[in-house]
Regions:
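Short-chain dehydrogenase/reductase
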Residues: 23-27, 71, 75-87, 117-125, ...
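Conserved active-site helix of classical SDR/Rossmann-fold NAD(P)-dependent CH-OH oxidoreductases
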Residues: 30-31, 84-91, 124-129, 160-161
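Conserved beta-loop-beta element that borders a ligand/cofactor-binding pocket
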Residues: 49-50, 87-115, 125-127, 135-143
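C-terminal substrate-binding subdomain of Rossmann-fold SDR/epimerase-dehydratase oxidoreductases
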Residues: 127, 133-249
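Conserved catalytic-site region of short-chain dehydrogenase/reductase
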Residues: 12, 47-63, 78-84, 96-97, ...
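NAD(P)H-binding glycine-rich loop region in Rossmannoid oxidoreductase-like domains
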Residues: 1-25
């Protein structure tokens, strides 16, 4: 079996400023991995995709059948298409060699060992970093948007658990599967929780034009039916573990 986790990725600033690097290096990574698969002919492949694979115009609860139904958002086009290419190559290996596969379409993952900075982090890591930096000098935390945007936030251990459950399957389903919580969390709720847990409330929001899509949550019905499982870590518990690691590493 091959489990393909490797990718070059980052937050929105990184994606916007490193399009060539992301495009070329993810092509090279995928080429090397699938050349290895071609050479070694494993029975099964598990690949990690991204919610960036979904069409940019979609807003709401995202279902696997929507993949490939439209153009990706310009801000993540290189990363998103590299993940869609993984999926298409999985289909090709299935058709030509009978190689079973599972392609996990990942929500916004967070947890210990995440990236915590201004340029390469995703939403949770980036906001936690802003809290830590502001708290050093009692500064105001300046955040993009109004906090109204709703996102699907999944703790890293739950992603690992889903992969383990797939490893225990004798036969894979040969399709993409969403890997999220299916629960939408407004960014304002995330920030309020962090304010309470860190006892720091100096937050300044931006404007509505920075919110992006107001609702992007992964529909988990197919995953739940297939694995008889849903993620177990609540946002509060996941944040507690993440903050404990980050502030005490």
């Amino acid at each position: 079996m091959v489990i393909h986790l490797l990718a070059i990725y980052g937050g929105l600033p990184y994606c916007l400023n490193n399009r060539v690097k992301m495009g070329l290096e993810n092509l090279e990574i995928n080429s090397n991995v699938y050349r290895y698969i071609e050479k070694t002919n494993p029975a099964k492949i598990i690949t990690i995709g991204s919610g960036c694979e979904y069409p940019g115009y979609l807003d709401g609860y995202l279902k696997e059948e929507d993949l490939g139904a439209g153009k990706l958002h310009q801000s993540v086009i290189h990363y998103g298409y590299s993940k869609l290419m993984q999926l298409q190559l999985c289909y090709s290996f299935l058709q030509e060699r009978g190689t079973q596969f599972e392609h996990l379409v990942l929500a916004n993952m967070y947890g210990p060992y995440d990236r915590f900075d201004l340029h390469n982090s995703h939403v949770v890591g980036g906001i936690i970093y802003k809290f830590k930096e502001a708290m050093k000098n009692n500064d105001v935390i300046k955040l993009m948007g109004t906090g109204a945007a709703v996102r699907d936030l999944i703790y890293v251990d739950d992603v690992s658990e889903m992969i383990v459950r797939l490893l225990q399957k004798d036969v894979l389903s040969n399709r993409p599967l969403n890997c999220g919580t299916g629960v939408g969390t407004p960014i304002s709720t995330l920030v309020n929780l962090l304010c309470q847990k860190l006892n720091y409330h100096k937050v300044e929001w931006g404007n509505a034009s920075e919110d992006g899509a107001l609702l992007k949550v992964l529909d988990m019905s197919k995953t739940k039916d297939y694995l008889n499982w849903t993620p177990e870590t609540s946002l509060e518990e996941g944040l507690d573990k993440t903050l404990d690691w980050y502030f005490n590493e």
